[in-house]
Amino acid sequence: MYNNRFKNFLILLISFLFVLPAFTQVKLLIPMESTQSDHLKAYGIAYRHLMNTKEVDWLLNYRGGSFMFGYSTTLEEECKTKGVSYELLDGTMTAQVYSDSKNEENNTDVVRLEKVAKIAVYVPPNALPWDDAVQMVLEYAEIPYDKLWDEEVLTDKLKGYDWLHLHHEDFTGQYGKFFASYGSAPWYLNQQKINEDMAAKLGYKKVSQLKLAVVKKLKEYIANGGFLFTMCSATDTYDIALAAQFTDICESIYDGDPADPQANSKLDFTECLAFENFTVDLNPLVYEYSNIDVTGQLLQMGQFNDNFSLVEFSAKYDPVPSMLTQCHTAVINGFLGQTTGFQKNLLKKNVTVMALKDGTDYVRYIHGNYGRGTFTFYGGHDPEDYQHAVGDPKTELKEFPHSPGYRLILNNVLFPAAKKKKLKT
């Protein structure tokens, strides 16, 4: 009887030892193809997993850019709670996924995400009559972030953050060039006062001088390894402010003295990150900064003809633009902003084009390197509100959990966590 019990114990022990390796190799896969139940919340799960000092494998171009995790009951329960589709993989299935992703014949690869990026959003303290797409999607995905503005930027508070977002900011000091339409509106006057007070507090005579100082500090942040992501008017006004630093493009309604009528001949493009050889619109009543933007051209096409296509990159040779363009669709519905897109011929040669309107030179999404960091510019205001106007209601992202336009934003949040690896030659 004793021997039988001992034999049974040995059988159970041996069985356990054989099963254990298979169990420890079980993975949880979050597929990101069109069948995913909530694409946006999937990014939040990946981000929080990284916050807990755990690694995530980003499977570039594999089933829509899927995420693979070491299995835990906690992770599985979180997927259920957040309404995110997932699959459980045993050891054999996991090996097959890695094999498929690493196959030289496939435009796929595995990128290991290791260290979560600490996020900040540049936003003024006053309430403005429009919403910020990045803040909305971060909150929907439940990704934590901090807010900061000019004073924090100029007092070196950025050093504690890996990734910074700028949205709908006018770095030229012209308050968005809203004067003609909203110059007497309470929100506009409040915006002007808050900016002028901040400029005076920090020792600047003009708001344009304050914003130029901020832009230069942001450029220093990128050079030191920061990741900058901008949308809407923060894309082109960033470089316009740098180009105009030796002249005056602001009329008296904005800064109390006239603009230099020869300002365009005095622009210096050497310090610009992304654009060159552009012309600034000096009319203070025209709701446009320069000829970089293509909003007018896209309006003429009409909403139903406005879409843009993602450029396909080699996952193995160009991992960064590949990460930034992961999506479950290659064509995305367009959406307007104060700055919607960029004229291709005005881009610097070192800028990578990641999306554009087919058959045109209207670019929507670009990326580049500066120093040890990177910048990404994404035209448009709200990916799920085609022509978001001042005072329009907030977009409810629970109605758009599969939004490809918002998904591009979240790609930018995750890619700084990628383990750097030597590129193949």
Describe the residue ranges of each PLM region.
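Catalytic cores of eukaryotic secretory-pathway lumenal/extracellular enzymes that build
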Residues: 188, 203-204, 211, 243-246, ...
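Extracellular ligand-binding/catalytic regions of CAZymes and related secreted enzymes
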Residues: 25-31, 37-68, 347-352, 356-425
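Catalytic beta-strand/loop cores that center a nucleophilic Ser/Cys/Thr
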Residues: 132, 139, 236, 266-390
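Bacterial N-terminal signal peptides that target proteins for export
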Residues: 1-10
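Helical hinge/lid and interdomain linker segments adjacent to catalytic or ligand-binding clefts
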Residues: 27-28, 33-37, 67-77, 127-235, ...
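Cleavable N-terminal signal peptides
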Residues: 11-12, 22-23
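Hydrophobic targeting/anchoring helices
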Residues: 24-132, 141, 380, 387, ...
